[in-house]
Amino acid sequence: NGWISYKKSKLCNILFTKKLSELALKNNITVNCLHPGFVKTGFGKNNTGVIGLIIKSLMSLFAIRVEEGAETIIYLATSNNVKNISGEYFYESKVNKPSNFAENNKSADNLWDLSIKILKNKGLTL
């Protein structure tokens, strides 16, 4: 299912960020992740029928402009307010609590270990 895969990929982004932040802080590097919001994009454009109609309707009613979706990205890249914040999940330029699944340090460690293993299998090292 595409939606389940999409949600899992977002969970992995948060878990990976937490672990990367833990390691990067040793070198005074901060790492955060974010949710840009429900942005008007081509997401779901290949859906047809009732699902396609629902997605198009929701997009036209609730989605924000791309420029608005970029605000948190720009904020994290440029603001002094977040220069000492790392390993967090941001939404609307504020730290936001992710799902309980995203708070699981063991899952973050497992994802990191799997990522390293995949890289090694491809002949890459970190």
Please report, for each region that a protein language model flagged, where it lies by residue.
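Catalytic loop of short-chain dehydrogenase/reductase
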Residues: 1-29, 35-57
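Non-catalytic terminal and boundary segments that flank Rossmann-like NAD(P)-dependent oxidoreductase
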Residues: 2, 101, 105-126
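Low-complexity, flexible helical/coil segments
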Residues: 6-13, 52, 66-73, 123-126
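C-terminal helical subdomain
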Residues: 9, 33, 57-97, 103-109, ...
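Non-transmembrane alpha-helical segments in soluble domains
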Residues: 17-21, 74, 112, 116
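Surface-exposed helix-capping loop/turn segments at secondary-structure junctions
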Residues: 24-29, 83-84, 120-126
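Glycine-rich, flexible loop/turn motifs
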Residues: 39, 98-99
